[in-house]
Amino acid sequence: MVPDSDKKKLVILGAGSHGLEVLSIVDDINRESNRYEVLGFLDDDKNKHQKEVGGVPVIGSLKSIEDFPDVYLITAIQGIDNFWKIEEILKDVCKDAKRFTTLIHPSASVSQRSQIGFDCIIFPHVTIGVNVRVGNHINILPNSVINHDSQIGDYSILTSGICVSGRVSLGKRCYLGSGTKIIQNIQIGEQCLTGIGSVVLNNLPNNSVVAGSPARFLRKTVAND
């Protein structure tokens, strides 16, 4: 166990339901290694300020990061309504990559021959295979599998029960709906969204919204300004 004096001080960006799930992951990590001390949440919803989420206080807005210069950060503001905006939000509040940590749930299976970037959250029962490259600011939700030699682009969200086959390339700012399956050797462009249960059999250009089995093009996502 890590002595209290050596624990990493952590602030969670986002005090919504996703933030509470991230807090639960920290709790599970601490049961095994006592690694983190959570100081609080930062959230732009002023109605949450000075209140508690899961017993942890909401201590300010995202801009309040400047008031906590010596703590680690983890981002928990991702969602289907704003997945393409996360990059710009984070650029506005913190440009120092060294301040972000990565959380890997103890039940996840992550190959030692994979690479995981910063500000990533690997949820329970995720499997990440050999030679997988996971970028930065990425969430991989429970029971998802990323197979060998695949690449996951920055700021992407992979929701529950995803299956990414071998040698798949996923671009930046993508959102994969629950249960999405992608066959091997597929290339998916930036800022793409798949509906729940989609089965992707073909390459997808940038800004594609697809759904169904097999996945069919529906429309384009909102352009990233």
Regions found by a protein language model. Give the residues of each.
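Hydrophobic, well-ordered beta-alpha structural blocks that scaffold small-molecule cofactor pockets
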Residues: 1-51, 59, 66
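Short glycine-rich anion-binding loops that position phosphate/pyrophosphate groups of nucleotides
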Residues: 18, 78-82, 216
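Conserved acidic residues
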Residues: 39, 71-72, 172
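Phosphate-bearing ligand-interacting subdomains
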Residues: 46-109
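Structural signal for interior beta-strand "rungs" in well-ordered beta-sheet cores
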Residues: 102-211, 215-218
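Generic C-terminal helix-cap and adjacent flexible tail
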Residues: 219-225
